[in-house]
Structure formats: structure tokens, C-alpha cells
A protein has these predicted regions:
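Catalytic core of pol beta-like nucleotidyltransferases
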Residues: 2-134, 143-320
Length: 320
């Protein structure tokens, strides 16, 4: 078990080093990853639930001689040797992210009035507080089952009218509406990178749906056995009588399945004919349960995993 903990602490720090992300001891423990092979499968000996406590992880970080060959620490953050600069970079990105959070909250306060919206969560770089000056702002939006196309259109129109929608070359501080799911909480992409993305989600509207999202996606713990949805992830934006009333009126007005079918057929056709949907290595999901648009997906999840494997292999070979 001790060798497993050593291997998985190292793997965790290497994985996040690829993303230029130094980690606190608590983060190393919470996001501790399992051993994986080249196909993103699991080490057969690591499939059982391991009892790796925060105290054990902290002890290994501070005292394990094997780990000390590879890692260093500064100001409470751990990282690979020679990467001290990541700490200052993370602190700077934290400041940038805090400023961008205000933009997201401003938009989300309006989106909560849109019919069928059930949850709004911050995703991507902003969720990890690693946004850069020119970063866009990713949201995951959950909508009532059976109304994903109606709700997506309404949200897109509203965010565009607010002048905050990302489109064309307008990227910085713009809302990227690239992921919608229904309250069935079906997630198609289930890999190491996706587990990272969903671990860091930050709900800003409707915490009840967020908890149900994690309960419906316990596959995340196959990659992150210590991760669990914590009570400190509370919604920042509360529902109000007015927002509930407007949603209720809108949902009654738009309740016809014919509207959803027409909008669904139109949007599916538009998505299919979009040149970005044909991008090699992209991941485009267009179903009644999930709408996801990642034309550059190959350079995200798969690329991160390949760099992670190569870096981990090089470290192990260098110290043999």
C-alpha cells in the first residue's frame, strides 16, 4: 500500500504539473489519482478503495525520501523540482480569476430567470482559479430533461444580448456556452481529464442539482478515489420568488413538445453543418441529454494525458 501511495502522489503532482498547477497538501489528497495504463485503464491492484488519509498523504509529502527526489515545496504548495515559478504564477492567476468571477456572477444572475435552467456551474480554468488575462469563461448549465434545445437557444440569446457571449474573435471575458446537460446528468466523456474538470466544478446557482449531478456521476471516483462533493461548494446566487415566477410562466408558455422538436431538429442540423464539427480530434455531442462542443478536445484531455505519461516515464527512467 505504501508503494501505491508514493506512486499515486507522484502521478498526481506530475499530472497537474502538465497543467502548470502546484498543489496544496489538501489538494494532493482530495484529487489523488489512481495508477493508469496507456489506455487510461486502471492498475488492477489499485481497483479496491484505498484508505489514504490526509495525514498519510501529508506525511509522505514531508518525509518520503523517494518522493523528495522528484518534488519540492514553497509557501505551502508542492510541485516537481525545478518548477518553483509555478507558485507565483498560480497566485497571480488566482487574482485574475477573482476579477473574472464577478463577470460570471453578473451573467448568471440573469440566466437564472431563463425557463428550464436548473443549475449553473463554473468550469474550466476559472473553476481552478487558473484563468489568464485573455481567458474566456466556461459554464456548465443543467436544464430540465426534455428541454435542452429550447433552453440552450434562450440562454444563448440572453447572453448575446448582454454582450457577454463568446463568438468569432471575441474571447476575453466572454461566456463560453459549450456544455449543456439535462437533469438526468448524463456525461459522455469519462476519462482522466474529464474527472479533473468535474472535480473542480463550482456551482453558482442551485446546489441541490449539483449534488445530484455528483451522485449520478460516481465514476469520477474511479479516477479520484478521495474525491467527494463537499458541503462548502454552496451556490452563491440564490433563487428568488421573481426568478421562480418568471421561469414558471416561461415554462408554461413553452411547454409544447413540438417547440422542442422543431428547435432540436434545427440546432442538430446547424451543428452538423458547422465546419468546426468536422475538426479532426474534436468532440461534439448533440443529443437530447447533452450538448457539448469541444472542437479542440484532442489538445485538451488526450494531449494532457500523453504529456503526463511521458513526463512520468521520464522521471522514473531518470532515477532508475
Amino acid at each position: 500500500m505504501h508503494d501505491k501511495l508514493y506512486k499515486n502522489i507522484l502521478a498526481t503532482l506530475v499530472y497537474y504539473d502538465v497543467m502548470d498547477y502546484p498543489m496544496t497538501p489538501f489538494e494532493v489528497w482530495k484529487y489523488l489519482i489512481r495508477s493508469v495504463d496507456k489506455n487510461q485503464g486502471f492498475d488492477e491492484d489499485f481497483m479496491e478503495k484505498e484508505d489514504f488519509s490526509l495525514a498519510k498523504v501529508l506525511a509522505y509529502l514531508e518525509k518520503n525520501d523517494k518522493l523528495k527526489k522528484y518534488i519540492d515545496s514553497k509557501n505551502g504548495y508542492y510541485f516537481l523540482k525545478g518548477r518553483n515559478d509555478l507558485v507565483e504564477k498560480r497566485l497571480e492567476k488566482n487574482k485574475i480569476s477573482e476579477k473574472k468571477l464577478g463577470i460570471v456572477l453578473e451573467v448568471a444572475r440573469v440566466i437564472r430567470f431563463v425557463p428550464y435552467v436548473r443549475m449553473i456551474a463554473i468550469a474550466g480554468r476559472l473553476a481552478t482559479k487558473s484563468a489568464e488575462k485573455n481567458s474566456d469563461l466556461d459554464l456548465l448549465i443543467a436544464v430540465k430533461h426534455g428541454k435542452v434545445f429550447t433552453c440552450r437557444l434562450l440562454v444563448t440569446i440572453i447572453v448575446h444580448l448582454l454582450g457577454k457571449r463568446r463568438h468569432n474573435n471575441k474571447i476575453k471575458d466572454r461566456i463560453c456556452l459549450n456544455h449543456f446537460i439535462t437533469t438526468k446528468f448524463t456525461i459522455s466523456a469519462r476519462d482522466m481529464f474529464s474527472s479533473h474538470e468535474y472535480c473542480f466544478l463550482k456551482p453558482i446557482f442551485d446546489n441541490d442539482s449539483f449534488m445530484r449531478f455528483h451522485n449520478s456521476n460516481d465514476w469520477i471516483q474511479n479516477y479520484r478515489p478521495n474525491f467527494s462533493h463537499s458541503s462548502d461548494n454552496i451556490s452563491i446566487i440564490k433563487d428568488s420568488r421573481l426568478s421562480r415566477l418568471i421561469r414558471r410562466i416561461g415554462e408554461k408558455t413553452l411547454q409544447s413538445d413540438l417547440i422542442e422538436n422543431i428547435l432540436g431538429n434545427w440546432q442538430k442540423k446547424k451543428i452538423k453543418n458547422n465546419p468546426k464539427s468536422q475538426t479532426i480530434g474534436g468532440l461534439i455531442i448533440s443529443s437530447d441529454e447533452e450538448l457539448a462542443f469541444w472542437p479542440n478536445f484532442e489538445n485538451q484531455g488526450p494531449a494532457v494525458f500523453e504529456k503526463f505519461q511521458n513526463k512520468l516515464r521520464n522521471l522514473e527512467n531518470h532515477n532508475q
